[in-house]
């Protein structure tokens, strides 16, 4: 897998092309990603880069975290993220190095991963796009009810994964093949066409698109 970066969703706006066409874009702030660990086949069984970004107040850094960041010689960040590396990727990157948005200068499309907005407990109509039942014709209580959830004595159970009411959202979601509209190295900004998962200020993982 290609090297990606950790960013923060700033919000949405629009930009205009020379032809006057309006393009909706999401602004992603990509601060310097500091390499905290380089995992190798010999030591860890797989190749990966572990990075952090941002800052965390000193009193919120646990002792294990403090030791890990101190060993890498980098400032404590707001989290740790790991990105798998393919054969030949990440060569020459050492612990303590900084990666910035400039690595996307020649990238046309990206995949963006984030945590979707939580919607709480929702019914089948909202959560799974179930059809509603009749509003009239003798139906007075079951307009938005899910309906049958199984068969009879055989199999005598409800199958795992059955679409039912429950907690909606707050899941890891990836939006693929978003066009890179602009890379602003001076302000550490990446502008991508369209929407990305999650709420404003949410953390995002941006990687070159796998299906591009």
UniProtKB/Swiss-Prot annotation:
Keyword Lyase: no
Gene Ontology biological process: translation
Disordered: annotated segments: 137-156
Listed GO MF terms: rRNA binding; structural constituent of ribosome
Gene Ontology CC: one annotated term: cytosolic large ribosomal subunit
Post-translational modification: Methylated by PrmB.
PTM annotation (N5-methylglutamine): residues: 153
One Pfam family linked to the record: Ribosomal_L3
Polar residues bias spans: 137-155
InterPro entries according to UniProt: Ribosomal_uL3, Ribosomal_uL3_bac/org-type, Ribosomal_uL3_CS, Transl_B-barrel_sf
RNA-binding keyword on record: yes
Keywords: Methylation, Ribonucleoprotein, Ribosomal protein, RNA-binding, rRNA-binding
Assembly description: Part of the 50S ribosomal subunit. Forms a cluster with proteins L14 and L19.
Family, similarity comment: Belongs to the universal ribosomal protein uL3 family.
Known function: One of the primary rRNA binding proteins, it binds directly near the 3'-end of the 23S rRNA, where it nucleates assembly of the 50S subunit.
Name listed for the protein in its UniProt record: Large ribosomal subunit protein uL3
Species for this entry: Shewanella amazonensis (strain ATCC BAA-1098 / SB2B)
Organism lineage: Bacteria, Pseudomonadati, Pseudomonadota, Gammaproteobacteria, Alteromonadales
């Amino acid at each position: 897998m290609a090297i990606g970066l950790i960013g923060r969703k700033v919000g949405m706006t629009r930009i205009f092309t020379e032809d006057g066409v309006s393009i909706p874009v999401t602004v992603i702030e990509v601060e310097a990603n500091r390499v905290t660990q380089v995992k190798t086949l010999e030591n860890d069984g797989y190749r990966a880069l572990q990075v952090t970004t941002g800052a965390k107040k000193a009193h919120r850094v646990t002792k294990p975290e403090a030791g890990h960041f101190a060993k890498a010689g980098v400032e404590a960040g707001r989290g740790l993220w790991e990105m798998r590396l393919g054969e030949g990727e990440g060569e020459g990157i050492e612990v303590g190095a900084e990666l910035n948005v400039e690595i996307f200068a020649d990238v046309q499309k990206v995949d963006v991963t984030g945590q979707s907005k939580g919607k709480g407990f929702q019914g089948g109509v909202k959560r799974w796009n179930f059809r509603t039942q009749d509003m009239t014709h003798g139906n007075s209580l079951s307009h938005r009810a899910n309906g049958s959830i199984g068969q009879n004595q055989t199999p005598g159970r409800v199958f795992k994964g059955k679409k039912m009411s429950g907690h909606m959202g707050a899941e890891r979601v990836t939006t693929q093949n978003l066009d890179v509209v602009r890379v602003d190295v001076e302000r550490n900004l990446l502008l991508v066409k369209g929407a990305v998962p999650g709420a404003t200020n949410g953390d995002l993982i941006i990687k070159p698109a796998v299906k591009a």
